[in-house]
């Protein structure tokens, strides 16, 4: 019997070591790759929204710099298409792409032409077409010759503020979900993680591990 137990222990040792190594890899990906990058996105998006509140002009160099910094931060996490970024279409709200039918400029043009009051409050703005939200919408408002001069300057200003505030809200929500629950779910599965939901979390953990070399 002792020989059988010893043999089983020897046989299972590599599996235990593999599981521990995999868990360590997932932990490293989350703590060194995912969370720092989403923190940067949230911080730069907050700075973008604050800059727009101070100067919403499309020609503002400060606003364009803030946009570039926040957009670069988004690009750094845009491959992490699982978990909190997919809740409520947050990733699409940040970057509606691809846009083969030109929905973003069409949506923005309609908003500006109608001076749509949806831009006046965060709750109503969050209900507009997702094509009119996020970084690509802001890019049109800052750099497109037609949209950056169309309609009322006051309304364009309000729209820029609405878009940037929404970007900040979505970015912060993704980070908050990672920090307050989702990371722990991947790092510390419980007995309840067995079954279909557990397999789903295991697949997500595997996907999380896959990004370690990016």
What are the language-model segments listed below?
Residues 20-214:
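Mature extracytoplasmic or organellar-lumen-exposed domains after removal of signal/transit peptides
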Residues 4-13:
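Sec-dependent N-terminal signal peptides
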């Amino acid at each position: 019997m002792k020989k059988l137990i010893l043999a089983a222990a020897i046989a299972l040792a590599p599996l235990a070591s593999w599981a521990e190594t995999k868990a360590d890899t997932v932990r490293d990906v989350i703590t060194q790759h995912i969370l720092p990058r989403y923190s940067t996105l949230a911080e730069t998006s907050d700075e973008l929204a604050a800059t727009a509140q101070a100067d919403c002009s499309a020609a503002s160099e400060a606003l364009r710099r803030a946009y570039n910094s926040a957009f670069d931060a988004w690009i750094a996490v845009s491959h992490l298409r699982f978990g909190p970024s997919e809740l409520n279409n947050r990733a699409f709200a940040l970057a509606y792409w691809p846009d083969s039918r030109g929905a973003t400029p069409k949506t923005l043009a309609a908003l500006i032409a109608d001076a749509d009051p949806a831009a006046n409050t965060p709750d109503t703005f969050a209900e507009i077409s997702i094509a009119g939200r996020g970084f690509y919408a802001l890019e049109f408002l800052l750099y497109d010759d037609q949209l950056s001069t169309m309609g009322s300057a006051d309304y364009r200003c309000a729209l820029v503020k609405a878009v940037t505030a929404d970007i900040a809200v979505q970015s912060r929500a993704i980070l908050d979900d990672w920090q307050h629950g989702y990371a722990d779910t991947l790092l510390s599965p419980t007995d309840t993680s067995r079954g279909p939901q557990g397999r789903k979390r295991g697949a997500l953990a595997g996907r999380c591990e896959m990004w370690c070399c990016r």
